[in-house]
Regions:
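Catalytic core of pol beta-like nucleotidyltransferases
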Residues: 1-20, 28-34, 45-94
Length: 94
């Protein structure tokens, strides 16, 4: 993901109270295609709810014109999926 796109995300991270954000999946591995979405895992500074996650996703998609999947670190459980997120993790904020 180009640095310019990451810089565009930072004001949104600040406005949503994001403590940490990282890419994972094909974009983090550099294997994305034009049809790929951006997989993002975040941690909030404060208590959050589903509306915060959905709002962040929508605002990122509107600002960058690419589809996003947003999950939280808190939602990760042990197992293959969590392992793959941590293996691919490329911290871009926090």
């Amino acid at each position: 993901m180009p640095d310019a796109m990451i810089r565009e995300m930072i004001p949104l991270f600040k406005s949503y109270g994001i403590k940490k954000a990282a890419l994972f999946g094909s974009v983090a591995r550099g294997q994305n295609t034009p049809d790929s979405d951006v997989d993002l895992v975040v941690s909030f500074e404060k208590k959050y709810d589903l509306l915060d996650i959905v709002g962040l996703k929508q605002d990122l998609e509107e600002a960058l014109q690419v589809p996003f999947d947003v999950i939280t670190y808190e939602s990760l459980k042990s197992g293959a999926f969590a392992d793959s997120v941590y293996t691919d993790e490329r911290v871009i904020y926090g």
